[in-house]
Amino acid sequence: VREIIRKASGETLDLKAYEADMRHLIDTYIEADASRPISPFDNMSLLDLIVKSGIANAINSQLGGLKGNKDAVAETIENNVRSKIIREHLTDPAFYEKMSALLDEIIAARKAKSIEYEAYLSQIAALAAKVHAGQAEDTPKTLNTPGRRALYNNLNQNEALAIEIDEVVKTTRPDGWRGVQAREQVIKAALYGVLQDEAEVERIFLIIKQQPEY
């Protein structure tokens, strides 16, 4: 039961916006007895399981307590996808804003019953895979690190510019630069040499700061 609640909440998502729905889900569909392992995949996150074994197996393995209630299953999956988007948003705002908009469209279609449930599951599974991977399927192969991909997505998909900035940052960054103003200014100065725009420097710097590879 605890595990089902954790999956439904997306682990770290602030559920204030969903409290009424989640309370109904918990009160109606989850018994208050001791939890027990459901499958060998029980320690895997719901999104991991959707990507690695398919959405049908993920539902059967981790959402057994909601079996028979399609809306509850759908909302649980949606909450987990939304949670991932919120957690990763600052690392690549453009990509995750796009993913958030796609999620909103899928949710709206489900609630309006404008698509069959099987089609809904296919769409949400495809979106979950993109969110889990942190990149679109058509991303150029030269953008072979999360940092490069984030720069590409937030620079109007300018591949050459993304690679140039990636290389500039990696060749000019001082050790231990995060949180040290003088060292951060070294990187900003290097960025200005490429971008020639102070506002753009500040915007891109915030993304770079969120990327561990830099």
Predicted stretch roles:
Residues 1-214:
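Catalytic cores and motor modules of nucleic-acid processing enzymes
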